[in-house]
């Protein structure tokens, strides 16, 4: 049993990215689907698909790279889990961080759902900072 399923998902994505895997499978949950939707919308992954397996299901995340086979370049430069089970990080609407001076994205879980830092500023809500990705 994992103590932090979101950190496990981010680590699987990071490891697949390092070795240029085509896709990576992670156990599914609603919050993981929401995070994948943000990663897809922001252009960090190509696509994701929910696969029913009779239990909780699997999310197959298709990775995204720039260039062709020999000259591939990673789209995801870094991905970091911020709020952890042992140390939660909550921010107000005025304290929402910018990642790499606006180049990266902070993923937050708010009362309005899982959103990016930009969306949270527009909505005027704060919440728990899940991860930074750039």
Curated annotation (Swiss-Prot):
GO terms for cellular component: ribonucleoprotein complex; ribosome. Gene3D superfamilies: 3.30.1370.30, 3.30.1490.10. InterPro entries: Ribosomal_uS8, Ribosomal_uS8_CS, Ribosomal_uS8_sf. It comes from the Bacteria. This is Small ribosomal subunit protein uS8. The keyword Cytoplasm does not apply. Belongs to the universal ribosomal protein uS8 family. One of the primary rRNA binding proteins, it binds directly to 16S rRNA central domain where it helps coordinate assembly of the platform of the 30S subunit. GO terms for molecular function: rRNA binding; structural constituent of ribosome. Part of the 30S ribosomal subunit. Contacts proteins S5 and S12. It holds the Pfam family Ribosomal_S8. GO terms for biological process: translation. Keywords: Ribonucleoprotein, Ribosomal protein, RNA-binding, rRNA-binding. It comes from Pseudothermotoga lettingae (strain ATCC BAA-301 / DSM 14385 / NBRC 107922 / TMO). PROSITE patterns: RIBOSOMAL_S8 (PS00053). Disulfide bonds: none annotated.
């Amino acid at each position: 049993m994992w103590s932090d399923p979101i950190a496990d998902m981010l680590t699987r994505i990071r490891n697949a990215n390092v070795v240029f895997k085509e896709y990576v499978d992670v156990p599914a949950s609603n919050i993981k689907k929401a995070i994948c939707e943000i990663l897809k919308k922001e252009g960090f992954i190509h696509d994701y698909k929910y696969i029913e397996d009779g239990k909780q299901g699997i999310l197959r995340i298709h990775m995204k790279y720039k260039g062709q086979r020999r000259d591939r370049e990673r789209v995801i430069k870094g991905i970091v889990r911020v709020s952890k089970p042992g140390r939660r990080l909550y921010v107000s609407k005025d304290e929402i961080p910018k990642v790499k001076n606006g180049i990266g994205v902070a993923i937050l879980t708010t009362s309005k759902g899982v959103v990016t830092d930009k969306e949270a500023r527009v909505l005027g809500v704060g919440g728990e900072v899940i991860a930074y990705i750039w």
